[in-house]
UniProtKB/Swiss-Prot annotation:
The keyword Cytoplasm does not apply. Keywords: Ribonucleoprotein, Ribosomal protein, RNA-binding, rRNA-binding. HAMAP family: Ribosomal_uL22_B. GO terms for biological process: translation. InterPro entries: Ribosomal_uL22, Ribosomal_uL22_bac/chlpt-type, Ribosomal_uL22_bac/org-type, Ribosomal_uL22_CS, Ribosomal_uL22_sf. One of its GO terms (molecular function) is rRNA binding. It comes from Thermotoga maritima (strain ATCC 43589 / DSM 3109 / JCM 10099 / NBRC 100826 / MSB8). It comes from the Bacteria. NCBIfam families: rplV_bact. Belongs to the universal ribosomal protein uL22 family. GO terms for cellular component: cytosolic large ribosomal subunit. This is Large ribosomal subunit protein uL22. CDD domains: Ribosomal_L22. The gene is rplV.
Length: 159
């Protein structure tokens, strides 16, 4: 559930000004980690990302440990970083964490020349990936949802 921008009454500019302040009062339930410019094809990395999305952190680590893919090693590092961020920055317990988002975006492509017959050349694209993993605390989601609803009521009452 996201904060709704009021249609009339409270001005949009005032809403956006207060938005950051209001959102900081909500309990922290998620942490993220991003690995950029990783030298692996996004298509290959997405296959691994799809297997761990929605799983508990322990289950995701087990899946990654037994996967023979190169992307699994990279994903494991990013997941470990997200869990460490959750513990250190927000004090979330590892037992309640699950992988809420895990996605792979395209990074830049390095273009290389591949010599072919008769003096021709083909261009080879070496692809890169940006990998993002977001972990959430299941036990605090209800608390977060209630706080968000209260905040929404507060904003709508100011209209």
């Amino acid at each position: 559930m996201k904060l709704q921008v009021p249609r009339n009454g409270l001005k949009r500019s005032l809403f956006h000004k207060k938005r950051k302040e209001l959102l900081s009062s909500l309990p922290k339930i998620e942490a993220r980690a991003v690995a950029k410019y990783i030298r692996i094809s996004p298509r290959k990395a997405r296959a691994i990302a799809n297997t761990i999305r929605g799983k508990s952190v322990e289950e995701a680590f087990q899946i990654l440990a037994f996967s023979p893919k190169k992307a699994a090693r990279i994903m494991e590092k990013v997941l470990k970083s997200a869990v460490a961020n959750a513990e250190n920055n927000f004090g979330l317990s590892v037992e309640n964490l699950y992988v809420s988002e895990c996605y792979v975006n395209d990074g830049p492509r390095m273009k290389r020349i591949w010599p072919r017959g008769r003096g021709r050349a083909d261009i080879i694209q070496k692809r890169m990936s940006h990998i993002t993993v977001v972990v959430r605390d299941r036990s605090r989601e209800d608390e977060y949802r209630k706080a968000l609803e209260e905040l929404q009521k507060k904003i709508s009452s100011e209209e």
